[in-house]
UniProtKB/Swiss-Prot annotation:
Family as reported in the entry's similarity comment: Belongs to the GatC family.
Gene Ontology MF terms in the entry: asparaginyl-tRNA synthase (glutamine-hydrolyzing) activity; ATP binding; glutaminyl-tRNA synthase (glutamine-hydrolyzing) activity
Record's catalysed reaction(s): L-glutamyl-tRNA(Gln) + L-glutamine + ATP + H2O = L-glutaminyl-tRNA(Gln) + L-glutamate + ADP + phosphate + H(+); L-aspartyl-tRNA(Asn) + L-glutamine + ATP + H2O = L-asparaginyl-tRNA(Asn) + L-glutamate + ADP + phosphate + 2 H(+)
Source organism: Bifidobacterium animalis subsp. lactis (strain AD011)
E.C. number(s) listed in UniProt: 6.3.5.-
HAMAP family (alphabetical): GatC (MF_00122)
Name listed for the protein in its UniProt record: Aspartyl/glutamyl-tRNA(Asn/Gln) amidotransferase subunit C
Keyword Nucleotide-binding applies: yes
Length: 98
C-alpha cells in the first residue's frame, strides 16, 4: 500500500509551481493515497488467463454508405454566417502583427 508523505506532496506542488497551504497538502495527501489504493486494487486482479491486447474494444469502422448528395449553394452555406463578405466567411483576426 503506497502512501504519499507530506514532503512528497510539497515536492509535487513545487514541481508544478503551485503553492499549497497546509490544508491543501493534507487534502491532497488523503486524495492521492485513495487513488494509489484504487490503482493497487486494480493491479491485484487475476490476469494470468487474459490474453494481452492493445485495445479491449474491437476496432471496427462503422461508416455510413457513401451516397452522393446535393451540396449547399454558396448562398445557403453563408446564410448562417454572422458576417460574410464577397462570398466568404469573415472571422475576427486571432493573430496580431508580429
Amino acid at each position: 500500500m503506497p502512501t504519499f508523505t507530506r514532503e512528497e506532496i510539497v515536492h509535487l506542488g513545487d514541481l508544478a509551481r503551485i503553492a499549497l497551504t497546509d490544508e491543501e497538502i493534507t487534502r491532497m495527501q488523503s486524495e492521492l493515497n485513495v487513488i494509489a489504493d484504487a490503482i493497487d486494487s486494480v493491479q491485484e486482479v487475476a490476469t494470468a488467463d487474459v490474453e494481452p491486447t492493445a485495445n479491449p474494444v474491437p476496432l471496427e469502422a462503422y461508416l455510413r454508405p457513401d451516397v452522393p448528395a446535393t451540396p449547399l449553394t454558396q448562398a445557403e452555406a453563408l446564410s448562417g454566417a454572422p458576417v460574410a463578405e464577397d462570398g466568404m466567411f469573415v472571422a475576427p483576426r486571432i493573430l496580431g502583427e508580429e
